[in-house]
């Protein structure tokens, strides 16, 4: 993500013009068996700029797509992009843990495909005044939904040193979390934080020089942690994954792309729990109805190719996992 932000700062251009969906061909390949058997329904839980959705609609003429996004700007732009398929598209302003409610609002209970492309979107990174990118001085906002109440500035200015340390350590995996938190508390006593440039300067000073030379941009982990906290990303994902898996019809498939280890571990655990037998290990035979609900379609997490990473820096950190429902839940 650091390399991506630096490149955006250097070469300009809007997300709408330069958006390249990550692992597009692999996503289409994995979802195709579930979507090519006549009329089908797929949910793009992280619609963003609509690149994956556009390709799915083009590949499957009988497909109905439900697109979810918490960002009203993303819904508007994706709606323009998907306008040629508007009779087969339902766009819903929702966070993806509102999965069941979104489907119920469309009188749907089961779906044939589910797609999650997690993390911050190209659109959000390119909109400087939203504060996601540390390469630009901007308001400390970081809300994926501009109508949400809590901003990154609120976190920085109101959390205790202990709370800040927890956020930085848990969500940024920042080994200097306590040191950074103490520096934030000292600095905000002089004046509240409201711009990202001041925070970046603090992080340069707080992170030891040796780590700055070897550990990437010193702001990377803190900005990730603040973004996750502001948007409750891990809590939302923890609720969304089981809801999405529950809604998959038998034969339905789900693809999840994550961009840091915290998300990927959650996806791995959610899939592993459903892919194992519920029969007690000391019994010699499988109990009826206790077999796995899903089968894994990927061996571990798949990575983007070197060629894709070179062409699309956002793909450098992607981890893709996929699964197929093979039986109804007990």
Swiss-Prot record:
GO terms for molecular function: rRNA (cytosine-N4-)-methyltransferase activity. It catalyses: cytidine(1402) in 16S rRNA + S-adenosyl-L-methionine = N(4)-methylcytidine(1402) in 16S rRNA + S-adenosyl-L-homocysteine + H(+). It is found in: Cytoplasm. S-adenosyl-L-methionine binds at residues 50-52, 69, 103, 117, 124. It comes from the Bacteria. It is an enzyme of class 2 (transferase). The keyword Protein transport does not apply. GO terms for cellular component: cytoplasm. GO terms for biological process: rRNA base methylation. InterPro entries: RsmH, SAM-dep_MeTrfase_MraW_recog, SAM-dependent_MTases_sf. Its EC number is 2.1.1.199. Keywords: Cytoplasm, Methyltransferase, rRNA processing, S-adenosyl-L-methionine, Transferase. Belongs to the methyltransferase superfamily. RsmH family. Specifically methylates the N4 position of cytidine in position 1402 (C1402) of 16S rRNA. PANTHER family: 12S RRNA N4-METHYLCYTIDINE METHYLTRANSFERASE, S-ADENOSYL-METHYLTRANSFERASE MRAW. This is Ribosomal RNA small subunit methyltransferase H. It comes from Saccharopolyspora erythraea (strain ATCC 11635 / DSM 40517 / JCM 4748 / NBRC 13426 / NCIMB 8594 / NRRL 2338). The gene is rsmH.
């Amino acid at each position: 993500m650091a390399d991506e932000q630096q490149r955006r700062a250097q070469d300009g251009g809007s997300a709408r013009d330069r958006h390249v969906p990550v692992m597009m061909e692999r996503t289409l390949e994995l979802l195709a068996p579930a979507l090519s058997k006549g009329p089908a329904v797929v949910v793009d839980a992280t619609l963003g700029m609509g690149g994956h959705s556009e390709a799915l609609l083009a590949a499957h003429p009988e497909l109905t797509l439900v697109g979810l996004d918490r960002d009203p700007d993303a819904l508007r732009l994706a709606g323009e992009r998907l306008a040629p398929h508007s009779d087969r598209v339902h766009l819903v302003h929702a966070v993806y843990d509102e999965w069941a409610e979104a489907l119920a609002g469309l009188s749907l209970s089961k779906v044939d495909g589910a797609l999650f492309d997690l993390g911050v979107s190209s659109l959000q990174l390119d909109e400087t005044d939203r504060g996601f990118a540390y390469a630009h001085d901007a308001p400390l906002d970081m809300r994926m939904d501009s109508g949400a109440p809590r901003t990154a500035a609120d976190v920085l200015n109101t959390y205790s040193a202990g709370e800040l340390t927890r956020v930085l350590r848990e969500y940024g995996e920042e080994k200097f979390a306590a040191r950074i938190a103490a520096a934030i508390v000292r600095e905000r006593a002089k004046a509240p934080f409201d711009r990202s440039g001041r925070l970046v300067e603090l992080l340069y000073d707080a992170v030891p020089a040796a780590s700055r030379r070897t550990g990437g941009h010193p702001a990377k982990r803190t900005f990730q942690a603040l973004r996750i906290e502001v948007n409750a990303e891990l809590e939302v994902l923890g609720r969304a994954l089981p809801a999405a898996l529950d809604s998959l019809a038998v034969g339905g498939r789900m693809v999840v792309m994550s961009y840091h280890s915290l998300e990927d571990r959650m996806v791995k655990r959610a899939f592993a729990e459903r892919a194992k037998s519920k029969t007690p290990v000391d019994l010699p035979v499988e109990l009826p109805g206790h077999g796995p609900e899903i089968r894994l379609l990927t061996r571990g997490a798949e990575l983007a190719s070197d060629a894709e990473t070179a062409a699309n820096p956002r793909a450098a950190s992607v981890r893709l996992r996929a699964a197929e429902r093979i039986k109804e839940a007990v």
